[in-house]
From Swiss-Prot:
The lineage of its organism: Bacteria, Pseudomonadati, Spirochaetota, Spirochaetia, Leptospirales. It comes from Leptospira borgpetersenii serovar Hardjo-bovis (strain JB197). It holds the Pfam family Arg_tRNA_synt_N. This is Arginine--tRNA ligase. SUPFAM superfamilies: Anticodon-binding domain of a subclass of class I aminoacyl-tRNA synthetases (SSF47323), Arginyl-tRNA synthetase (ArgRS), N-terminal 'additional' domain (SSF55190), Nucleotidylyl transferase (SSF52374). Disulfide bonds: none annotated. Gene3D superfamilies: Arginyl tRNA synthetase N-terminal domain, HUPs, Isoleucyl-tRNA Synthetase, Domain 1. The keyword Aminoacyl-tRNA synthetase applies.
């Protein structure tokens, strides 16, 4: 057993060695042409792992899959140190049941050694950008999902040896930010007694007239939080004085620009506090404004022009994004000379490349899928390999209360924030929120059941895991933590004990595979199955430590120590606490 191998890799290696022996009698068959893989058994009664090797390669071997399976089983059965049992089931699946003694040995060298996770051979420097919400308001529920998953992805990648920088991109430049400032200014003037009106969607009134007449733009922000910000600004003496002066001088555009800056900073502070309460810390906050101020945005267009990827039409400069799968070529500089958001985004990713990242991963919202090909194309144009840039789409979140959807809308002011959700869920808001957001694959919409999230029984999947951890801690408070690997080796192995040992031993490979696939939900799914295996063990005959003989107690305690470690580490990677005591254990 090598230190850096998962149990699955060990079994696969044994299978490959078995295939080497098998194909000696097939001189015309090259091993490289064979499909050799293993997977978890779909039904635990057949074993721990299985392979469909015989079915997938029977044509190439020109032999019946059942006959191939029989020959392979005969070879692999000789590995009695690793396998308790190797057999096959028609039409040609070979099943592996791992020896309990091997499981115990593996657990000692991995789970109980303090170094739980195999490390990658070549660690990468990775930039992982997520959340990156516009600074136009507090973080919403979709951002909360991205925050929980992005932070967990970073933890998983770090666990297997990569160097990861978590980055938040601040869109603090452009028309939406200006409209945010205009919206705040409207509320300030309302507070000071001025009358305001709201622009209709089809109204084409010029912006200077809108500012002069104190009109809230159709695309402005109407949430109550804008009024709160306006009041806060007026309560700051220095800013209040600036506001008073500029209003008297009727310098509305200048004041709107100032309000944009102030409101953005207020919202960023709000967002950081929300993220902190959610246990999410970023290594870098990168401002879009710095790209424009340093002329990096227009500079990257020249890079694209040099390689022939820009053409002009009607005074616009257009990127040939259709060459990379986009449905049409995209404008990067408008006919008035202003760069589009796409060009700024290309400049931002060029900056990432120049910072020396081996991999660039972005998590985007549900309405950005069509944006991938054009940005990926630009990144390739800049000389970055396509496979080293990856975009993960975080799909929509539906909040459900009593089975009904709860509506969300930022501009209309009727939306639920991350802060609202954490507060709604009470003192367990962080743990419950983070776990619920990683329970499902990011590429699928998530129905967030508020009723289940508030349930503090073990029907709630978060509490189910935490109760399991607290239960083990309670056992150790009762009988002590003394344990023995030798005593564990001497235990009579019931099915419940063997099942739990296998689920413990799976932990490193589950983390390794989840990190490599960047799928945090796999950890959540694994932990649920693990806790189920522990519950079966806990309720099983002769597994109560307090009732066991001293020797059996030492062996069972060894298994429980490993189980506690898996739960604590697994929950920690998701950003969920593992309490030693719970008010209710049911």
């Amino acid at each position: 057993m090598k230190e850096n191998e998962t149990l699955k890799q060990i079994v696969l290696k044994s299978l490959e060695e078995g295939v080497d022996s098998l194909i000696v009698s097939f001189p015309d068959v090259e091993k490289s042409s064979l499909r050799i893989k293993i997977e978890y058994s779909r039904d635990e009664k057949f074993g721990d792992y299985s392979t469909s090797f015989s079915l997938e390669n029977s044509k190439l071997l020109k032999r019946n899959p059942i006959q191939v399976s029989k020959e392979l089983v005969e070879i692999l059965q000789k590995r009695t140190d690793l396998f308790e049992k190797v057999d096959f089931t028609p039409p040609g699946f070979v099943n592996f049941k791992i020896s309990p003694s091997y499981l115990l040995e593996y657990i000692e060298k991995s789970i109980l050694s303090g170094d739980h996770f195999p490390k990658v051979e070549h660690p990468l420097k990775i930039n992982l950008e997520f959340v990156s919400a516009n600074p136009t308001g507090p973080l919403n529920i979709v951002s909360a999902r991205a925050a929980a998953n992005g932070d967990t992805m970073a933890s998983l990648l770090k666990a297997i040896g990569h160097n990861v920088d978590k980055e938040f991109y601040i869109n603090d430049y452009g028309n939406q930010v200006f409209l945010l400032g205009v919206s705040t200014l409207v509320r300030i003037r309302e507070i000071k007694g001025e009358f305001s009106t709201r622009q209709e969607a089809d109204d084409t009134t010029p912006i200077d007239t809108i500012l002069e007449k104190n009109i809230l733009p159709a695309e402005g922000y109407r949430g109550e939080y804008i009024k709160d910000i306006a009041n806060a600004l007026l309560n700051e003496p220095k800013k209040s004085s600036q506001i008073e002066t500029l209003l008297k001088e009727k310098k509305y555009r200048e004041l709107a620009e100032l309000c944009s800056i102030w409101t953005v900073e207020n919202n960023l502070d709000w967002q950081r506090k929300d993220l902190d309460s959610f246990g999410v810390e970023f290594d870098n906050y990168f401002r879009e404004r710095t790209l424009h101020e340093s002329d990096k945005v227009l500079a990257v267009m020249k890079d694209l022009e040099r390689v022939g990827k820009i053409f002009e039409e009607d005074g616009k400069k257009i990127f040939r994004s259709t060459e990379y799968g986009d449905d049409k070529d995209r404008v990067v500089v408008r006919d008035d000379g202003r760069p589009t958001y796409l060009l700024a985004d290309i400049a931002y990713h060029k900056d990432k490349i120049e910072r020396g990242y081996d991999r660039i991963y972005d998590i985007w919202g549900p309405d950005h899928h069509g944006y991938i090909s054009r940005l990926s194309g630009a990144v390739q144009t800049l000389g970055y390999k396509k496979e080293n840039f990856k975009v993960i789409i975080s799909q929509q979140v539906n909040l459900l209360e009593s089975g009904q959807k709860v509506k969300m809308s930022k501009r209309a002011g009727s939306f639920q924030t991350m802060s609202d959700l954490i507060g709604f869920l009470g003192k367990h808001g962080k743990d419950v929120g983070r776990y619920f957001f990683v329970m499902r694959s990011l590429d699928a919409p998530l129905d967030f059941d508020l009723d289940l999230a508030q349930d503090q029984s073990d029907k709630n999947p978060v509490f189910y895991l935490q109760y399991a951890h607290a239960r083990i801690c309670s056992i150790f408070r009762e009988v002590g933590t003394e344990s023995s690997a030798e005593a564990a080796e001497s235990l009579e192995m019931s099915e419940e004990r063997k099942r739990l040992l296998f689920w413990i031993a799976r932990f490193p490979e589950e983390i390794f595979d989840s990190a490599n696939s960047m799928e945090p939900h796999r950890v959540a799914n694994y932990l649920q199955s693990f806790a189920k295996a522990f519950t079966g063990f806990y309720l099983g005959k002769n597994n109560r430590l307090k009732d066991a003989t001293p020797e059996v107690r030492l062996g069972l305690a060894r298994i429980c120590l490993a189980a506690r470690s898996v739960l604590a580490e697994g929950l920690g990677l998701i950003g969920v606490s593992a309490p030693e005591k719970m008010e209710k254990e049911s």
